[in-house]
Structures are given as structure tokens and as C-alpha cells.
Swiss-Prot record:
<dbReference type="GO" id="GO:0005634">
    <property type="term" value="C:nucleus"/>
</dbReference>
<protein>
    <recommendedName>
        <fullName>Polyamine deacetylase HDAC10</fullName>
        <ecNumber>3.5.1.48</ecNumber>
        <ecNumber>3.5.1.62</ecNumber>
    </recommendedName>
</protein>
<dbReference type="GO" id="GO:0004407">
    <property type="term" value="F:histone deacetylase activity"/>
</dbReference>
<dbReference type="InterPro" id="IPR023696">
    <property type="entry name" value="Ureohydrolase_dom_sf"/>
</dbReference>
<keyword id="KW-0862">Zinc</keyword>
<keyword id="KW-0479">Metal-binding</keyword>
<dbReference type="GO" id="GO:0033558">
    <property type="term" value="F:protein lysine deacetylase activity"/>
</dbReference>
<keyword id="KW-0233">DNA recombination</keyword>
<dbReference type="Pfam" id="PF00850">
    <property type="entry name" value="Hist_deacetyl"/>
</dbReference>
<dbReference type="GO" id="GO:0040029">
    <property type="term" value="P:epigenetic regulation of gene expression"/>
</dbReference>
<comment type="function">
    <text>Polyamine deacetylase (PDAC), which acts preferentially on N(8)-acetylspermidine, and also on acetylcadaverine and acetylputrescine. Exhibits attenuated catalytic activity toward N(1),N(8)-diacetylspermidine and very low activity, if any, toward N(1)-acetylspermidine. Histone deacetylase activity has been observed in vitro. Has also been shown to be involved in MSH2 deacetylation. The physiological relevance of protein/histone deacetylase activity is unclear and could be very weak.</text>
</comment>
<dbReference type="GO" id="GO:0000118">
    <property type="term" value="C:histone deacetylase complex"/>
</dbReference>
<keyword id="KW-0234">DNA repair</keyword>
<dbReference type="GO" id="GO:0000122">
    <property type="term" value="P:negative regulation of transcription by RNA polymerase II"/>
</dbReference>
<dbReference type="GO" id="GO:0106047">
    <property type="term" value="P:polyamine deacetylation"/>
</dbReference>
<keyword id="KW-0072">Autophagy</keyword>
<feature type="region of interest" description="Histone deacetylase">
    <location>
        <begin position="1"/>
        <end position="302"/>
    </location>
</feature>
């Protein structure tokens, strides 16, 4: 399975036929620019391109009224003056003789993508469509939107495939009030939207775009609005919104499908949005969503934005503005779906595993390399002496293989790796690997988090420990509320993940931790696993490090008071240094 790309050139046919400053930005070039960018970067050829058919009137009727569908169909025969008159009946809308055809293709593209993902033909995908859809309502066009593509796709997934939980993430800079209205009383759809709001003074100027609108009836609590009351929101704001608001809700909701209303006017450079998030940020957001719903993500284009340029450097940073190049935010969002985090060159070896004892049988996924290489014996012994630890012969053999894997990651030859060590040598091996990293990079910036003991403790802003949460809610709060904010704030070159004797993590917990740490470091993770655990952990870790979705943590259970207390203690101590932990508004 791969990534689908859904597009049809006929969707460029509709265009504005009269002067209208408000509507002139909705032009064919908004769509062709996105496709051209994908082609220039070589992403189109890595996707499975799917054909598109028009959505049927029955499929449109999953969301829209028969009268409204008939009205849009009638525009095929109207002249310019009649089209102009009809358009003025709606807010920020224009009609064209090809509007009905284009809008049916746009809805059909979303349906085609959902079918491909839910039948297993592809793992995820992107539909480049026009006109957009998230503002359109049951019987009204609105904000350039004619048919609500994402809402139709969600209803289709429920009706045809029997899905009971669908997450819709709307990161367009405008509130997708059309989607909200359609699902506001439906508990099977969790709708999340961030949008420029400015206390109701930004389009669409609706009080129901505010945070206190949470759905109604049985759907109360399933609408989540995050209104931006100022412009200039950047990468840290978007990441904080995902880590502290969206993802905790999404994990508890446990969706079977994720639909993204992918509007990119929320990126830097768009004059309408006036936000500061770089294109790379959307790649990270997409990768964070991939741990949900078995990785079944369907992104459907809304407002493409102005396609700001971004860095083509091999190591893009989330805290720097984009520089001159030909990359678009749409391309950055697609890259992680193709298992290419951000813009880092793909190493020759994706995943490597080194065993303490050669020839041990492991059931590993295809494409995972059994690494037999080792650092030279003299070099290994020198590192062991430097650490002043007693290594037995078996320990030295395992250390040599671990050093070889580490050098491969640091030199860009290996993306991720799993190494085994003996129980007694785990701590010493980790110490040697840390020293090797410091020697290679010439820096001593180390963030050390220990999961052990019965109480949270802190020795410095870079060294602390926490007890292992025993509930799913506590473990998720630990990852989303502490580990990932620290990882994104620290921006490490790589992650060393040591799973020593009695580490206490269940396989699913270790897999989720590894999967979610891939994004901040571009996949550069070395997992050090105690040899008695390797048979159970190796395949699971290899799968998630390769980009597969981690296994479920099981039924959701609320965090205990003790787990909440430990987390709050650490956050209170660390907040002054780590900005992504600073999510509470200052007192007035």
C-alpha cells in the first residue's frame, strides 16, 4: 500500500467571469500550482494516481438538499448576467457554466480517495480539488465552496463502510462552519477547527466559531473550535494546539478514519491568514496524525494559500522562516505520508537491527536489515575504558554493534536502528553511546528523561524522571503533555531510547513512544533493547520506525490523580525553560 494522489484537470475549468475583488483569488492557478509543485519535487511519481468520476446526485444528497443540487445543476445553462445575479445571493461565491461539473468532480475525488483508503488499496492520500467545500451548507454555497467535499466523504464512509468514529481536522485559516453545522448533533464525527477569529471580527463573522460552541444534543462535546484572536500564530502555536488540545481528544475518541480539510492559507505568507507557521510545520502535523486510525488519513484541499517558499535544506528547522525555493506547504504535508519526514534525504538503509548473538531468529518486516557489522574491537574497548565500566566479552560484542549502528545514523547512512544489549550492560552501553554522540557532534546538549521510580523528580531543566503511568490516559498525557513538547523544544539531532531490564513499558507503549518521537528528529532513533525483551519488541519497534501505525494501547482509562499530580509537578518546574509547556494564558 502507498499514498494516493487524486486530481482531475477539468477542475480548473471554472473561473470568475466578472470583476469581483473578493472572489478573484479563487482561480485555477491555485490548483495547478499545487500539482506543479508536487511534480517538481518528484512526489507525484511516488504516489498512486487515482482516476476521478463525478459524484452522483445521490452521493451529493448525503449532505445537500435536492433543491440546492438542482439549483447548482441549473447554472450550466445560465448566461453571464444570470450567473452574476445568482452569485450575489450568496456570501463570497461565484458561479460559472462549469461549476456543477467541477464541484461534482471535487466531491467525487474525495469519495474516490476514501474508497481507496478504506478498501486497503492505499494507506493514505491527498485529493487536490477545486472548488473547496468546508464552508458550503446543506442548501447554500458559501466562501467559494459549492458542495461540502469532506462532509460528503464522511457521510459516505459511515454509510458504505459502517464507520462509527470519524475525526475531521480543519486547519484552514477560516472556520469551516459548513462542516460544523452538518455534524453538530452527530457524536460519530469529532470536528476540530482552528481559525482566525479575532473576537468575531474575521470572516465568516460568526459567534458559533468561538470556543464555547461545542455541538448540540447528542453531538455536544464533539465540536472543538480553537479561535485565534490575533494574527501571527506560528509553529509553536500550531504544535501546542495539536499536543495539548486535539491529540488528547483524538486518542480518547479513537477514530477509524481521519479526514483533513487541508487549507494552507494558515501558513506563512498568505495575506488573508497573516499567520507565521512554516510549511515544514504541516509535515510534522501530518505525521502526528498518522498514529491515529491505523494511519488511514485522507487530506482534501480547501484553500491552497499563496504557496510560500520554504527551505530545501536537508535539515529544516521549525524555528526558522522559510527561505527561497520551490516548495509549497501542500508538498510538505504530503511528504510524511510517503514516509519521508520533512525534507531529509532518505538514507540508504531505513531500519537496521543488530543482535547481541548472531543468527538469532527474529520475525522482522520486509526491508529491515540485519546488521552484522561492528566497530573495531580496539575502538570498542577504548570507549568501554573511557566509560570506566566493566564489560564482559558478550557485552563488548553488543557494544561494538551498537556503536556501528550509531555511527550509521549520525553519518546519514541509517535512519533508525534497534540494538540489543545484555541486562547488566544496558546503562553502561547507553552511557558510551551518549559520549559517542557528544564526540561526533561536538556539543554537550543532552536532554535526559528517565521513566522509573515511584515519584517524579527533577535535577535540572535537562534531567528529570517520572514514574511510569499505569493508565492509558496517564501514559498519553505523559507523551503529549511532556515528552513531545520537550522534544520539539529541544530539537535534538537524534533520540536514544533505552529499554533496559524491568523497563515496565508494554510493547504498545514502547511502540507509541518511538512512533511519536520520529517526527521531531526526522526518524533518527536508536532503540537499545535488553536482549531478553528483543523477541517481543523487535518487530513492533521495526514496524513503527518504518512508519507503520503503532498498535492500540487498549481501552481508554482516565489518568489517576497520582499520575496527574506527577505530570503537573514536572510541568510546573520545567515551564520556565520550555515554551511548548507554557499553554495557560497569563492572568489578566
Amino acid at each position: 500500500m502507498g499514498t494516493a494522489l487524486v486530481y482531475h484537470e477539468d477542475m480548473t475549468a471554472t473561473r470568475l467571469l466578472w470583476d469581483d475583488p473578493e472572489c478573484e483569488i479563487e482561480c485555477p492557478e491555485r490548483l495547478t500550482a499545487a500539482l506543479d509543485g508536487l511534480r517538481q519535487r518528484g512526489l507525484e511519481e511516488r504516489c498512486q494516481c487515482l482516476s476521478v468520476c463525478e459524484a452522483s446526485e445521490e452521493e451529493l444528497g448525503l449532505v445537500h438538499s435536492p433543491e440546492y443540487i438542482a439549483l447548482v445543476q441549473k447554472t450550466q445553462t445560465l448566461d453571464k448576467e444570470e450567473l452574476h445575479t445568482l452569485s450575489k445571493q450568496y456570501d463570497a461565491v461565484y458561479f460559472h457554466p462549469d461549476t456543477f461539473h467541477c464541484a461534482r468532480l471535487a466531491a467525487g475525488a474525495a469519495l474516490r480517495l476514501v474508497d481507496a483508503v478504506l478498501t486497503g488499496a492505499v494507506h493514505n492520500g491527498v485529493a487536490l480539488v477545486r472548488p473547496p467545500g468546508h464552508h458550503s451548507q446543506r442548501a447554500a454555497a458559501n466562501g467559494f465552496c459549492v458542495f461540502n467535499n469532506v462532509a460528503i466523504a464522511a457521510r459516505h464512509a459511515k454509510q458504505k463502510y459502517g464507520l462509527q468514529r470519524i475525526l475531521i481536522v480543519d486547519w484552514d485559516v477560516h472556520h469551516g462552519q459548513g462542516i460544523q453545522y452538518i455534524f453538530e448533533d452527530d457524536p460519530s464525527v469529532l470536528y476540530f477547527s482552528w481559525h482566525r477569529y479575532e473576537h468575531g471580527n474575521f470572516w465568516p463573522f460568526l459567534p458559533e466559531s468561538d470556543a464555547d460552541t461545542v455541538g448540540r444534543g447528542r453531538g455536544q462535546g464533539f465540536t472543538v473550535n480553537l479561535p485565534w484572536n490575533q494574527v501571527g500564530m506560528g509553529n509553536a502555536d500550531y504544535l501546542a494546539a495539536f499536543l495539548h488540545v486535539l491529540l488528547p481528544l483524538a486518542f480518547e475518541f479513537d477514530p477509524e478514519l481521519v479526514l483533513v480539510s487541508a487549507g494552507f492559507d494558515s501558513a506563512i505568507g498568505d495575506p488573508e491568514g497573516q499567520m507565521q507557521a512554516t510549511p515544514e510545520c504541516f509535515a510534522h502535523l501530518t505525521q502526528l496524525l498518522q498514529v491515529l486510525a491505523g494511519g488511514r488519513i485522507c487530506a482534501v484541499l480547501e484553500c491552497p494559500g499563496v504557496y510560500p517558499e520554504c527551505s530545501d535544506s536537508p535539515d529544516p528547522s521549525l524555528d526558522k522562516p522559510p527561505t527561497n525555493s520551490t516548495c509549497t506547504v501542500a508538498e510538505d504535508s504530503l511528504s510524511p505520508c510517503l514516509d519521508r519526514p520533512c525534507h531529509r534525504p532518505t538514507p540508504p538503509i531505513c531500519i537496521a537491527v543488530a543482535l547481541a548473538v548472531s543468527g538469532a531468529a527474529l520475525d522482522l518486516p520486509p526491508g529491515v536489515l540485519h546488521q552484522e557489522g561492528s566497530a573495531l574491537r580496539e575502538e570498542t574497548e577504548a570507549w568501554a575504558r573511557l566509560h570506566k565500566s566493566q564489560f564482559q566479552d558478550d557485552d563488548l560484542a553488543a557494544l561494538g554493534k551498537s556503536l556501528c549502528l550509531l555511527d550509521g545514523i549520525l553519518d546519514g547512512q541509517i535512519r533508525s536502528a534497534i540494538a540489543t544489549t545484555t541486562a547488566l550492560a544496558t546503562a553502561a552501553t547507553l552511557g558510551v553511546l551518549i559520549q559517542r554522540c557528544v564526540a561526533h557532534r561536538g556539543q554537550r546538549r543532552i536532554l535526559w528523561l528517565s521513566i522509573r521510580g515511584k515519584e517524579a523528580d527533577i535535577w535540572s531543566m535537562f534531567h528529570f524522571s517520572t514514574p511510569l503511568p499505569q493508565t492509558t490516559g496517564g501514559f498519553l498525557s505523559f507523551i503529549l503533555g511532556l515528552v513531545l513538547p520537550l522534544a520539539y523544544g529541544f530539537q535534538p539531532d537524534m533520540v536514544l531510547m533505552a529499554l533496559g531490564p524491568a523497563h515496565g513499558l508494554q510493547n504498545a507503549q514502547a511502540a507509541l513512544l518511538a512512533a511519536m518521537l520520529r517526527s521531531p528528529v526526522g526518524g533518527r532513533i536508536l532503540a537499545l533493547v535488553e536482549e531478553e525483551s528483543i523477541l517481543q519488541l523487535a518487530r513492533t519497534l521495526a514496524q513503527v520506525l518504518h512508519g507503520e501505525t503503532p498498535p492500540s494501547l487498549g481501552p481508554f482509562s482516565m489518568a489517576s490523580p497520582e499520575e496527574i499530580q506527577a505530570l503537573m509537578f514536572l510541568k510546573a518546574q520545567l515551564e520556565p525553560r520550555w515554551k511548548l509547556l507554557q499553554v495557560a494564558a497569563p492572568p489578566p
